[in-house]
């Protein structure tokens, strides 16, 4: 019985705890309602402050008609820096893009007419593929080039040996060595070059064009040589070896002296005639 009496007060105290819980729940709900109301008002204020005036993505077909888009483009154009100079006395020409458009249209039309393989071979049109028929000609040209190089170096070696031998025979005197060095002639080297065992010309199917003959009326010797050889004179006359020994240049000062002497004699004769008349 004592146990039952001890348990009964606990059962009677249970409704008191339920009422306290209900009161706490009601207070919490009121606090939550107050917090949500305050948060909602704060969210509205922040949304109004942070609300952007820029429009979202628009359809491209309607972008030109949208006043907001037009306004943004005009503002961007106004922000671009301008030029601080003026054109005086001239007209400013505006560049036309018609030529570029025409070129693009031509290229597109050409690409449309060509097939895939032809379009791939367009950059290779300037290339020339070697033919098997030209192998003999190429081989002949290689032989000629090799023979010419070998012959040239042999001629240089022979010329150097001859020069060393002549300097050794001349002795230690500088005057004799200078005389030997002055006797070096280009024609001798060419004679040595063309007098070798392999000094022969081979005919190739690709003939060289003949140069036309040019004659000079001022120099008779030049015309005679040109008519005999039939080659074009591409050398300056001053650089020729016989320039100073030419007949016309050899006595150029004597002709002037003779002319001046004749003029002086004529003047003296005129003066003497005048004196005789006065007497």
Curated annotation (Swiss-Prot):
Amino acid composition bias (Acidic residues), ranges on this chain: 93-104, 213-224, 267-279
- Residues covered by region (Disordered): 1-40, 56-120, 200-279
GO BP term, pick one: maturation of LSU-rRNA
Biased-composition ranges for Basic and acidic residues? 73-83, 232-245
Q: Which domain of life is it from?
A: Eukaryota
Please give the GO cellular component terms listed in this UniProt entry: preribosome, large subunit precursor
One matching Pfam family, short form? Rrp15p
The record's similarity note reads:
Belongs to the RRP15 family.
- Name of the molecule in the record: RRP15-like protein
């Amino acid at each position: 019985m004592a146990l039952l009496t001890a348990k009964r007060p606990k059962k009677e105290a249970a409704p008191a705890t339920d009422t306290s819980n209900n009161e706490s729940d009601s207070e919490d709900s009121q606090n939550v309602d107050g917090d949500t109301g305050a948060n909602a008002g704060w969210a509205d204020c922040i949304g109004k402050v942070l609300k952007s005036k820029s429009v979202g993505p628009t359809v491209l077909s309607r972008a030109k008609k949208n006043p907001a888009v037009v306004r943004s483009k005009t503002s961007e154009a106004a922000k671009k820096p301008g030029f601080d100079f003026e054109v005086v006395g001239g007209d400013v020409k505006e560049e036309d893009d018609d030529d570029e458009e025409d070129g693009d249209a031509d290229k597109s039309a050409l690409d449309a007419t060509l097939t895939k393989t032809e379009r791939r071979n367009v950059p290779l049109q300037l290339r020339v593929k070697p033919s098997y028929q030209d192998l003999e000609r190429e081989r002949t040209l290689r032989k000629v080039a090799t023979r010419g190089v070998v012959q040239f170096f042999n001629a240089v070696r022979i010329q150097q040996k001859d020069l060393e031998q002549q300097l050794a025979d001349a002795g230690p005197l500088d005057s004799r060595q200078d005389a030997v060095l002055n006797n070096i002639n280009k024609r001798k080297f060419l004679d040595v070059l063309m007098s070798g065992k392999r000094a022969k010309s081979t005919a190739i199917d690709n003939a060289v064009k003949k140069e036309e003959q040019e004659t000079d009326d001022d120099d008779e010797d030049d015309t005679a040589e040109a008519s005999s050889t039939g080659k074009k004179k591409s050398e300056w006359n001053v650089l020729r070896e016989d320039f100073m020994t030419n007949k016309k240049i050899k006595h150029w000062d004597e002709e002037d002296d003779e002319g001046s002497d004749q003029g002086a004699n004529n003047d003296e004769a005129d003066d003497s005639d005048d004196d005789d008349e006065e007497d």
